[in-house]
From Swiss-Prot:
Belongs to the ZW10 family. Its main location: cytoplasm. Keywords: Acetylation, Cell cycle, Cell division, Centromere, Chromosome, Coiled coil, Cytoplasm, Cytoskeleton, Endoplasmic reticulum, ER-Golgi transport, Kinetochore, Lipid droplet, Membrane, Mitosis, Phosphoprotein, Protein transport, Transport. InterPro entries: Zw10/DSL1_C_sf, ZW10_C, ZW10_C_2, Zw10_middle, Zw10_N. It comes from Rattus norvegicus. It holds the Pfam family Zw10_middle. It is a peripheral membrane protein. This is Centromere/kinetochore protein zw10 homolog. It comes from the Eukaryota.
Length: 777
């Protein structure tokens, strides 16, 4: 630095080195002299106490002069030296920048040289199938290229060429690695590659090459070197994902979905093969322990032969990062594999009966052992997987499956044929399951109130209710509905021995059965219920049968179900009105249909007018015959189907409709000749004689006579109809006698206006008729 300042001063031309040195030396000596004089003066002043005032002032003047000289010299040095120093600094900065640019260029050239060397060495290693060194050299070339790209001053065209070269070389090594991978890991597929058929699965094979094949002329690298090279190049996840998907599709999933399929491991001197064989079995789905064992066998072979291979020492360069191939493959296949095991194996192992739940512990244990073995092989990490969670949550799955099976079975029964019937009634044996007696702890405690009587007499009622008072009357119901009710009882019985959660689900599943019936049956069988009167009657009975059981169904199980359900919710009574209404509305709709058909047939009778005309009489007679035929047909269709009381009311209502229509038409006639009256009487006599025959609720004719004799009870217009027949054949005197001043049977049957109208229609206008009309008041 001193030489640099000297050089600057030498070039300045304003100050010479020798001159400065001389003057500085002189100043130094002068300073020393003055210092000595000052010390001497102080000594004299304070030590010797001599008057030295004048000498001191002179010395002060000399010091001030010397200080001024020093300041001037310093200012001159700073001015001239700083100016020349600034000029030199700029030159030095320029030189430094040039040096930095040269260093950058030199560094870029060095990176280019390293890139070129790496590519050359890579080509040599690739030619010798030393994939790991080749991959590492390619990685070094990649790093060199990244450094070159980070320098903005580098030629973009050259960078593009280098990038393209690197891409080509990477694809080249990947191609060679892929070729050797296909030789080391060989798949053999059937022509169709169809995994759904057993024949195709039996033709699928996987071969893992462990040593150099004799037929192979060129040496093959080891599987470990290929996998490590893939890892260095960043392609290992992609390769393992592709392998894992094929493993799932062609080996693991077929083993789970096909119970007869088993894996066979064949070991050759230079390879290990995984193929299939079929063993006869009656199972539609493999038991979980068997499926786990088949999967574990395949994964053990893969873990030993493919995923846990040592790296060749002569191929390693530096530290090799730990690669857990089994863990990587496990991440690829486990989610789909566990889902497949759940859907095709564990789901079907769920017991259908709560008594078998205890046996399911074996399956839970086998699932735990299966996961433990996979963790030991490092296919799985430490967390509990969905497979084991599913197996342990057996109570919930059992309840869900049981409820699903119940609803499916119920819907199948609801959509089955209605006309397949069974007879029920007080005398028929029920096949509903017997309920166990409640334990002593569950018995209902009845509080007995003690009442004191003054006179302790016999408190029993004189008359008692018939034992059948609360029984469902004898009728026929669908066999499917009887099975449906049995299913409801069995499900509730199952709930009594189940866990709280399961019991609640089963109870509400039974309620859902009846809600489903209310929605499905009227919709699914709508057309048949509208067209076929027998099915409408059976459906009516079905609804009444269900409502009858719902009245006491909850009460029967209240003391046996879990306490959660014993707070008043264990009931089905709220469903009873809906079922009664459902059955009644369906049957009433059928009754309206039958009424419409009867009235339509009677409309062809031409209002029963002009019966002396053969054509009119024939039409009326035909209409009456058709109506009676329809009623008899309905009587046969509903025979032994409807309860007797419902049957008689229904037939009585329809017959009453016919009779009321005939009465209305006849009483509306304005003129009835003698011949007309005779023929009208004949038509009415036909109805009167054959009408009771439609009352045949039972198949035994002898038992039906009772109901045929009680026709007036069910047909309100029966007695007026008989009075009408009498009037058609009676004289004015007889009519007057039957009126009996408004107290006779005729007055009970008809109002006076209708009686007068009939008299006017039947008899000519004479004094006798006028007298008779006068009596009708």
């Amino acid at each position: 630095m001193a030489s640099f300042v000297t050089e600057v001063l030498a070039h300045s031309g304003s100050l010479e080195k020798e001159d400065l040195g001389t003057r500085i030396s002189r100043l130094t000596r002068r300073v020393e002299e003055i210092k000595g004089e000052v010390c001497n003066m102080i000594s004299k002043k304070y030590s010797e106490f001599l008057p030295t005032m004048q000498s001191a002032q002179a010395l002060v003047t000399q010091v001030d002069t010397l200080s001024n000289d020093i300041d001037q010299l310093k200012s001159r040095i700073e001015t001239e030296v700083c100016r020349d120093l600034h000029i030199s600094t700029v030159e030095f900065t320029n030189l430094k920048q040039r040096l930095e640019r040269d260093s950058v260029v030199l560094n870029l050239l060095k990176q280019l040289q390293e890139f070129s060397s790496a590519i050359e060495e890579y080509n040599s290693a690739l030619a010798e199938k030393k994939y790991i060194p080749a991959a590492r050299l390619l990685e070094e070339a990649q790093e060199c290229l990244k450094l070159l790209k980070s320098k903005k001053c580098f030629d973009l065209k050259m960078l593009k060429s280098l990038s393209m070269e690197l891409t080509v070389q990477k694809q080249n090594i990947l191609y060679h690695l892929g070729e050797d991978w296909q030789k080391l890991v060989v798949w053999k597929f059937p022509p169709s590659k169809d995994t759904s058929s057993l024949e195709s699965c039996l033709q699928t094979e996987l071969h893992l090459c462990t040593e150099q094949p004799e037929k192979e002329m060129t040496p093959l690298p080891s599987i470990s070197s290929v996998l490590l090279a893939f890892s260095i190049l960043g392609e290992l996840p992609t390769k393992l994902k592709s392998f894992g998907q094929m493993l799932l599709k062609y080996i693991l999933k077929p083993l789970v979905t096909c119970p007869s399929l088993h894996a066979v491991i064949e070991r050759q001197p230079n390879s290990v093969s995984i193929c299939f064989q079929s063993l006869a079995t009656d199972s539609e789905h493999p038991p979980p322990p068997e499926a786990f064992a088949k999967i574990q066998l395949v994964l053990e072979v893969l873990q030993k032969q493919l995923l846990d291979l040592p790296l060749d020492a002569d191929l390693e360069i530096g530290k090799v990062p730990e690669i857990v191939l089994a863990e990587m493959l496990g991440e690829v296949i486990w989610e789909d594999l566990s889902d497949c095991l759940i859907r095709n194996c564990l789901v079907y192992s769920i017991p259908t009966n709560s008594s078998k739940l205890q046996q399911y512990e074996e399956i839970i244990q086998s699932t735990e052992e299966f996961e433990k073995s996979l963790k030991e092989m490092r296919f799985l990490k430490g967390d509990t997987t969905d497979l084991l969670k599913y197996a342990r949550n057996i109570n919930s799955h059992f309840a869900n499956k049981k409820c699903q099976d119940v609803i499916v079975a119920a819907r199948h029964l609801m959509t089955s044929e209605i006309h397949n019937t069974v007879k029920i009634g007080p005398d028929c044996e029920e096949t509903l399951p017997d309920l166990p007696s409640p334990d002593a702890d569950h018995r209902l405690q009845v509080q007995v109130c003690k009442v004191q009587f003054t006179d302790a007499g016999n408190l029993e009622p004189e008359t008692s209710l018939d034992p059948r008072s609360f029984s469902l009357p004898t009728c026929r119901i669908s066999e499917a509905v009887k099975k449906l009710m049995e299913l409801a009882y069995q499900t509730l019985l199952e709930a009594t021995t189940s866990s709280d959660q399961c019991a609640v689900q089963l109870f509400y599943s039974v309620r859902n059965i009846f809600h489903l019936f209310h929605d499905v049956v009227p919709t699914y069988h709508k057309e048949n219920l509208q067209k076929l009167p027998q099915l409408a009657a059976i459906h009516h009975n079905n609804c009444m049968y269900i409502a009858h059981h719902l009245l006491t169904l909850g009460h029967q199980f209240r003391s046996r179900l879990t306490p959660i359900l014993c707070d008043g919710t264990t009931t089905f009574v709220d469903l009873v009105p809906g079922f009664r209404r459902l059955g009644t509305e369906c049957f009433l709709a059928q009754m309206r249909t039958q009424k419409g058909e009867l009235l339509e047939r009677l409309s062809s009778a031409r209002s029963f007018a002009n019966m002396d005309d053969e054509e009119n009489y024939s039409a009326a007679s035909k209409a009456v015959r058709q109506v009676l035929h329809q009623l008899k047909r309905l009587g046969i269709v509903w025979q032994d189907v409807l309860p007797v009381n419902i049957y008689c009311k229904a037939m009585g209502t329809l017959l009453n409709t016919v009779i009321a229509e005939m009465i209305g038409r006849i009483t509306a006639l304005e003129d009835i000749s003698t011949e007309d009256g005779d023929r009208l009487y004949s038509l009415c006599k036909t109805v009167m004689d054959e009408g009771p025959q439609v009352f045949a609720p039972l198949s035994d004719e002898n038992k039906n006579k009772k109901y045929q004799e009680e026709v007036p009870v069910y047909v309100s217009k029966w007695m007026p109809f008989k009075e009408l027949m009498i009037m058609l054949q009676a004289s004015l005197q007889e009519i007057g006698d039957r009126w009996a001043d408004g107290k006779g049977p005729l007055a009970t049957a008809f109002p006076s206006s209708e009686v007068k109208a009939l008299i006017r229609a039947l008899f000519q206008n004479t004094e006798r008729r006028a007298a008779a009309l006068a009596k009708i008041k």
